[in-house]
A protein has these predicted regions:
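Short alpha-helical segment that forms part of, or immediately flanks, the ligand-binding pocket
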Residues: 80-81, 105-110, 125-126
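Nucleotide-sugar-dependent
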Residues: 91-103, 119, 125-126
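Acidic, glycine-centered active-site loop in nucleotide-sugar glycosyltransferases
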Residues: 127-135
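Conserved donor-binding/catalytic loop of nucleotide-activated donor transferases
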Residues: 86-89, 107-114, 130
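Short amphipathic alpha-helix with an adjacent loop that forms part of the alpha/beta core around
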Residues: 79-85, 146-150
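Conserved acidic donor-binding segment of nucleotide-sugar-dependent glycosyltransferases
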Residues: 134-142, 151
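C-terminal alpha-helical cap of glycosyltransferases
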Residues: 8, 145-189
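Conserved catalytic-core segment of nucleotide-activated headgroup transferases in glycan assembly
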Residues: 3-75
């Protein structure tokens, strides 16, 4: 053989939580009561909840980290910038009315967020289906079930054995303690 190598494996462990965001006006018609149900039904150790808008105190009392977004305040960052800055993975856009146009959908789309929405959200539903950038659900309970399963699927991907050539220092990963993994044969961080 042209190359002799030893294979060692280590377990990738990512501590990041899935970051969910509610965007815009706090109103039952925009799905805020469903947002609160979602917060209550998902594991806070696996999900971070963010609210983007101007109802900061209410959102924080309901369990979300609040980020001020107000287009009337010229000194504050806009929605797209705040979504990117806070690394939001999934935007929760659960309008109960048949939206004809949703600014928050396009802001979330521009920021690279995946969208979860109701099948009754009108244009939001249409755009998610057209662009393939999210999922539509009949109930918030269905959405919560999907997100719990999604978290489990991500955990499987995140905590997977990675095999490397331990003879090459350049590619040997570092453990969280800074120790070169090639010296930990048979051990896991």
């Amino acid at each position: 053989p042209h190359l002799n190598y030893n294979v060692c494996s280590y377990r990738k462990q990512w501590k990041e939580k899935i970051r969910l965001g509610y965007l815009g006006f706090v109103s039952d018609i925009k799905g805020y009561s469903e947002w609160k149900k979602l917060i209550q039904s998902l594991d806070k150790n696996r999900f971070d909840f963010f609210y983007f808008g101007s109802a900061i105190e209410e959102a924080e009392s309901d369990g979300a980290k609040s980020v001020m977004v107000d287009f009337n305040c010229p000194n504050s960052l806009g929605m797209v910038e705040q979504l990117k800055k806070n690394r939001i993975d999934i935007a929760f856009l659960w309008s109960k009315c048949q939206e004809t146009y949703s600014y928050t959908y396009y802001e979330a789309f521009e920021a690279g967020c995946w969208i979860v929405t109701s099948t009754h959200s009108g244009n939001i539903t249409d755009q998610v289906l057209k662009n393939g950038n999210g999922r539509c659900f009949d109930t918030v309970e269905d959405c919560a079930t999907f997100l719990k399963k999604l978290q489990g699927d991500i955990d499987v991907l995140r905590i997977d054995d990675v095999k490397i050539n331990c003879n090459t220092d350049d590619f040997a990963p570092q453990s969280f303690g800074g120790e070169n993994m090639k010296y930990r044969r048979g051990k896991r961080p």
